[in-house]
């Protein structure tokens, strides 16, 4: 399985002046945790990290330290996440038939989740990791007035990995460029072409590191996992 990792986020909401994936989490850059989880997933055979050239020397040094078993390719991204994924699709090997796309900032995803998404691509043309929404969601108009309360049973919070067959996803991105479509995830493009996108149960801990308050929470989750591993070994 091939996987693309968008890793060009500037982290404005983190208050950082540089790529937020360079921020430290228990002594390692955020991206190191993401890459370690991806590399530990048995299904993954090829990794593409999509970023900006100014970060590449840092990522190259990181990759040397990690010494992952899979080949890792650094791919120059675009001005938006959507454009970056489009660039990543162009960089896939010609033999790639399926691809997972996983946000670099989701550094808490487990190898199990990544493997389950890869396995599900054997059945589905498109899928996303997602979890049921716990809160009641309100649809609000521009005046700040609630206009609808959707049934919570039908609402899921999208995560990554998201997985697709390569050719229809590439076509969807080409159409997006031609028609000026702008979406927040790749599944939305897939849906616009009429393809079904299936749900793979995600993980409550699969947070996207977005604001400063996410960092201490991520540290607690990772520390808890370390303690569990030590208890298992000990």
UniProtKB/Swiss-Prot annotation:
The keyword Transferase applies. It comes from the Bacteria. The record marks 152, 208 as: Positions MEP for the nucleophilic attack. It holds the Pfam family IspD. It catalyses: 2-C-methyl-D-erythritol 4-phosphate + CTP + H(+) = 4-CDP-2-C-methyl-D-erythritol + diphosphate. Transmembrane segments: none annotated. This is 2-C-methyl-D-erythritol 4-phosphate cytidylyltransferase.
